[in-house]
Each structure stands twice: as structure tokens, then as C-alpha cells.
């Protein structure tokens, strides 16, 4: 099992698909990495030589921000917004949708489970 960017990628899958198991690499970046390294898209992970795995690993380390670094940057950007006190930061702080979605109905994913309200009795 190959280990790239701190993630064990599955050996039976095609390399393009296996690279998407790394946080920060989607199908587009995976294809781009394969082209930079010069590998066929049909290759499977277990068919790769150690040199090819090393080339993929070096390309990712050099050109892409993945896993912990990407998560840390995202968290720092959100924290910066909250410290500024801007509208987006306030929405993050209150746990509400940030990008203008309606909240009168829906937004349950962001707001959490519905709180019961005592209705009037008949």
C-alpha cells in the first residue's frame, strides 16, 4: 500500500482515483499530477515502481497544498473572519449559513436539529 502525503492510498484502484483519497486533490488535480509525472491514466497503484511513487510524492509536495496544511489554512481563514467581526465571521460564529442562503426554513444542516416549540393545546 503506497503512502503519499500521509495517506495510505488503495492499491487495487487506478492511480487517478486513488489520489483523490488525499484531502485537497480532486479528479482535476489528480489528472494534472499524472500528466506532470508522465504516467498513463490507466495505471493501477500496485503497478507503480518506487521511483514513480516518489515522483508523485515530490510533485504533490512541491506544487499542491494538501491534508494538514490545507485544513490549517482553511481554519485560519475562518478564524480571521471571525476575529474581524465581519458579516461572514458573525455567520460562522453563530453557526448559520454564510453564503446568503435562506434560514426561515431549511438550513438544518448548519443550524442543527430542530428545537421543539410548545404549541397551543386544543
From Swiss-Prot:
This is Small ribosomal subunit protein uS13. Belongs to the universal ribosomal protein uS13 family. NCBIfam families: uS13_bact. GO terms for biological process: translation. InterPro entries: Rbsml_uS13_C (IPR027437), Ribosomal_uS13 (IPR001892), Ribosomal_uS13-like_H2TH (IPR010979), Ribosomal_uS13_bac-type (IPR019980), Ribosomal_uS13_CS (IPR018269). Transmembrane segments: none annotated. GO terms for molecular function: rRNA binding; structural constituent of ribosome; tRNA binding. It comes from Allorhizobium ampelinum (strain ATCC BAA-846 / DSM 112012 / S4) (Agrobacterium vitis (strain S4)). HAMAP family: Ribosomal_uS13.
